[in-house]
């Protein structure tokens, strides 16, 4: 297919961004246990913010490397500014990468629109002293969650309220959990991550990076809700069990931070509440921390050297890429 100079440049940029981001996404998943281990002494909230930031960073870094290095290098070396035949495989790869991003953005916009419509069906709020945002009662689902983006609301199901499933003290701790989600803008973070495509690598022992972030966000909200109080930790554990018994399988696609969004995390969260792990990694094992830092510096230096080598040979490689198929 014949394409003009600027369309060739657009295809090349799309392919470069897509390939680099996928490689960075795969690398992030591979090193995610090392990141979590390295941040062990920093606390749950620091881990949550790091996992959120690194997922955004894979896309930003892919764009920066493409537009600051690869595209200018191609423009400096390219002499043909007229139409040129481009391979169909290259065009298909560029179209697939564009569709990957477009699908993610469309999915996020759809969920946002459904959340707005769901908000409009809520009745009048009622007062709970512990709540920092308006509280509403819903028929069934979600049992207890923070719903919304710019003006989030806490929703509680009638089953939890009318059947007295939760004592007042337990309800206060659950509300404190949702208050933490509201203060840390976890729904906004979820929307931003939903706007971006993810490779979604996972195994039975290691979930995807997105799921790891979601689990860390819940653990961080648990910690904010209970603080150092063993009594509040027990109350929140009991609340999680009560919510698990009332959770419906008919999940609506809305922006929400539910008290128990993933039932498979129930055991892990209860273990963290009842048997918190002391944060002694930085003090007790400085040698291991030094080895990890040295390894990270080595990997980073190797990646920079490899990328510099690719940039130096980028024009002939880009020509081969453009003529695939």
Task: Please give the residue ranges for each predicted region.
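Short helix/loop segments within enzyme catalytic domains
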Residues: 27-28, 32, 114-120, 207-268, ...
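Loop-to-transmembrane-helix entry motif
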Residues: 53-57, 178-185, 277
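Active-site His/Glu-centered metal-binding helix of metallohydrolases
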Residues: 175-183, 220, 224
């Amino acid at each position: 297919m014949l394409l003009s100079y600027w369309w060739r440049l657009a295809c090349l940029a799309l392919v470069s961004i897509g390939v680099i981001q996928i490689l960075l996404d795969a690398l992030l998943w591979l090193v995610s246990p090392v990141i979590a281990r390295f941040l062990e002494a920093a606390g749950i909230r620091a881990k949550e913010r790091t996992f959120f930031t690194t997922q955004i960073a894979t896309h930003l870094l892919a764009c920066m490397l493409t537009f600051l290095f690869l595209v200018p290098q191609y423009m400096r070396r390219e002499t043909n500014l007229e139409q040129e035949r481009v391979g169909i495989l290259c065009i298909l790869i560029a179209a697939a990468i564009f569709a990957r991003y477009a699908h993610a953005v469309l999915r996020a916009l759809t969920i946002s629109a459904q959340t707005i419509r769901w908000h409009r069906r809520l009745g009048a709020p009622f007062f709970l002293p512990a709540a920092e945002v308006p509280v509403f009662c819903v028929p069934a689902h979600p049992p207890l969650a923070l719903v919304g983006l710019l003006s989030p609301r806490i929703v509680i199901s009638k089953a939890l309220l009318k059947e007295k499933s939760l004592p007042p003290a337990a309800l206060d701790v659950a509300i404190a959990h949702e208050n933490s989600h509201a203060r840390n803008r976890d729904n906004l973070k979820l929307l931003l991550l939903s706007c971006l495509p993810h490779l979604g690598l996972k195994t039975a022992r290691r979930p995807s990076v997105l799921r790891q972030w979601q689990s860390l966000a819940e653990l961080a909200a648990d910690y904010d809700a209970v603080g150092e109080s063993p009594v509040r930790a027990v109350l929140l554990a009991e609340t999680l069990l009560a919510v698990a018994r009332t959770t419906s399988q008919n999940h609506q696609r809305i922006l929400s931070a539910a008290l128990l969004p993933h039932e498979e995390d129930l055991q892990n969260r209860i273990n963290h509440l009842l048997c918190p792990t002391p944060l002694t990694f930085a003090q007790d094992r400085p040698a291991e921390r030094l080895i990890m830092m040295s390894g990270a510096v080595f990997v980073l230096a190797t990646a920079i050297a490899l990328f510099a080598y690719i940039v130096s040979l980028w024009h002939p490689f880009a020509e081969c890429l453009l003529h695939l198929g």
